[in-house]
Amino acid sequence: MKDKLEMTENEKKEFKDTLNLPKTTLEMRANATKKEPETQKFWEEHQMYKKMTENRDKANSFILHDGPPYLSSEKIHVGTALNKILKDILIKYKSQRGYYAPYVPGYDGHGLPIENKVVKNIEGGRNAVTPAELRQKCREYAHNSLKGQESEFKRLGVLGNWEHPYLTIDGEYEAEQVRVFGEMYKKGYIEKGLKPVYWCASCETALAEAEVEYADHTSTSIYVRFKFDDESVNTLKSKFDFLNTDKDMYAVIWTTTPWTIPSNLAISVHPRFEYTFFEYNNDIYYAATGLLANFLKDVDWKEEDIKVLGTCKGQDLENLTPVHPMYDRKSPILCGEHVTLDAGTGSVHTAPGHGLEDYEVCCKYKIGVYSPLDSKGVWTEEAGDLAGIPYYKGNSIVIDKLKDCGALLAAADIQHSYPHCWRCKKPVIYRATPQWFVKVDKFRDKALEEIKKVKFIPASGEARISNMVEGRTDWCISRQRAWGVPIPVFYCEDCGEVIVTDETIEHVAKMFEKETSDAWVKYSEKELMPEGFVCPKCGKTHFRKEKDIMDVWFDSGVSWRAVVEKRADELNHTPVDMYLEVSDQHRGWFQSSLLTSVATQGKAPYKQVLTHGFVFGEDGRKMSKSLGNYIRPDDIIKNYGADILRLWAASVDYRNDIKIGDNIVKQLAEIFKKTRNTARFLMGNLFDFDPEKDYVNYKDLKDLDKFALHKLYQLIENVTEAFEGYEFYKYFQCLQNFAAVDLSSFYLDIVKDRLYTSGKKSLSRRACQTVMYEILQALVRIIMPVMPHQAEDIWQNVPENQKGGLESILLSSWPEMKPEWNNPELEQEFAKILKTRVIVTKAIEPLRADKKVGSSLEVAVYVKYDENKDLLKSCENELCNIFITSQAVVADEKPADVLNEYTEDGCTVWVTKAHGEKCCRCWKYRELNADGICSDCQEAISE
């Protein structure tokens, strides 16, 4: 007989050919940059979005309404990418759960940023074209931006009704906006008035609160004294004995906007604050008692140089009349609750044309509005010798004039948070102009009541939007620009009547439906109004149309009507299930949608509001090209593919601000690769598995297999919980832990021998394949919402007999948790076995480090673990497979020829050389037959 150690290379190869080595058509490298577009083409050609929605019962629906991104650029920011990805993840998951979950993308196409960009490219500027021509150019710009953004959204793997998105610049949308305006006007919720509003002198338009950003700004603060007139002095003398003097008396105000002093019409005090009168340098002043010390310090007056005379309440000063230091007019003292003790003197400079609180307190005293500035922020003729000077140059001029007349007590630069225009980033002012307002106060209580019915994620969102709605003033919805939806109002030229009727609103709406809102500038008033219409007040027929357009927040804020209700067949109910946007939309789209919806239909337009944070660079700073931390979505996609970007979106706790950068992306690319390798290993070992014929019943599985299914049960349970709670980062953690720890480091590591060396059709191998089949089927479904391209690539390489006729993974259902898989008792047992395995590995590792052994199959282990002896004894036959050693014995005594001894937590492991010789087929050390293989291998070959 030939010696078994004298085996030829050909004979060794023959044994290798008997192994069940993995086979799969799934490539090792994802090659995502090339394959993802091919996958998207497959989805489009096979109408996957249509199939995803048409196969679902509309009675069981999840409607996520898309907040429209602004069309100021063809390129999207990484924050916009995050938003779209989160929406798409949710839509895909809900579809898997059996919901009818359509997605209608939207775009916001009106507004000043687009108008400004268009004007910059017009030779001769705005005045070189007609309003109609300008609007046409803006419309073309918006449509070009839409094409670019749509292409980038699709490249992210976002599925939706791309053939029929909604646009705020479409005629049908604009028509519904006009109808909402008409309904709100009819209810008395919209009015026109002269009132101070945020005004951008650079952009020459009013701004809503949502269009204002706060940034640090250096201003000059000044203290100015106003001398009381003789009548007021006599009144003070008669009221207070301590003022029985012939000295001059002054009120002192503090302001950070010296340029508004020419517009001062009053001084406000708090009726219940205490004010202290004191003498300094032979003059008498007063200041709020709580601010006196700070005031003296600011004007550099020493306390020992003043003489306190007495105190009074603010209400005692009401209607006294100091004289304006620059003009021959009086500035009466008013009582206002807005006065605080934060800074100054407790006497507030009051210019009703340049401050909302100033305006409100002056209204109570029937003091009119005075705002001598034009739309560019230049003083008008009303300002006298200041006429023609821009307000921002006025500070130094006003300060010099106050010095000249002896009214300036002190001036100093301060840095503070100041409102800036969100478009041009320049400081804004308050300016009183005729504007259209939504009178929020008339339905504020109902809006607050509706907020309480909405689920906010995170929960802090409720308080945030509630506080904003509770504290907000009237909503200024008019804008003095060209590119937007015109305010559908007419004025009678004969009697001045403001005309907004059901008839005019519907006529304009129908014209917009046919020709878009461009009709407003294209046609005359006569053509825009119903035929034969006469003024309801005077009966005349001479009309003038409104020139202002609506705030873009009003545009997008009516999408619940213009989109959700108008497309009821597709988006089949209101309120919708969810609005999902970045957190600053509490003051933007969430709020404008809430206000228009409550005003017209008495309810919130959404059931849930989910917000995510802003995206910053890897260093935690705002993204900037100059800082080198700016990263674009298409940069990541070109290098790694879209699924990496999607994986990033799922890996972060989006409720807070989020970081992204090269290092983060590289780490995610490694995780992506490991997930693919895991799936590839599973598929490779299922090449000959037919679930119809080879599936092994649960009761016939080994405990190790049952434990793997228990871990799968837990994975499905945990990721389902994560998705239902919108905590995608927990999904990511669960998936990563399952793939890296439960599978790669444990189950798959252990069963390789069984898969490769057992008989091809043996129960042992088929049992393992059954488990791997279940894991693969679940895993590819679980990764689909987040990594759909990867999931589709895997699915298209799954053997047909394992696909159940499923054309695409997009059409899959969420994995099922079979109750029998849930086995907590088995988990407790395996926790002890796993602990033992770790200790065994620690016992072997020094021998490998010292190169005394190569593979762990070269050793036998003897385990003495009294605490778990019975458990280990019950599965002793499987321990060598679990430990990946040639032999494993539950021992009471130390064996001979021990190579290493290791003890931990009451468990002692003795390591010896393995018994027998190395089987050239399975590489375990056993008793070998004449062919040089062990009996297990001989049995496997003989099948």
Question: Residue ranges of each PLM-predicted region?
Answer:
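N-terminal catalytic cores of NTP/NDP-binding nucleotidyl/phosphoryl-transfer enzymes
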Residues: 54-117, 177, 253-259, 268, ...
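Acidic, turn-prone loop/beta-hairpin segments
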Residues: 108, 197, 201, 207-215, ...
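Protease-associated
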Residues: 266, 273-347, 356, 360
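Residue patterns forming the tRNA-binding/recognition surfaces of aminoacyl-tRNA synthetases
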Residues: 2-32, 38, 42-46, 119-262, ...
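Cys/His-clustered metal-coordination modules, chiefly Zn-binding fingers
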Residues: 907-943
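Secondary-structure capping and boundary motifs in well-ordered enzyme cores
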Residues: 56, 60-67, 78-82, 86, ...
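Short functional micro-motifs and their immediate structural scaffolds
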Residues: 208, 429, 500, 542-544, ...
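Cys/His-coordinated zinc-binding microdomains
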Residues: 204, 480, 496, 539-540, ...
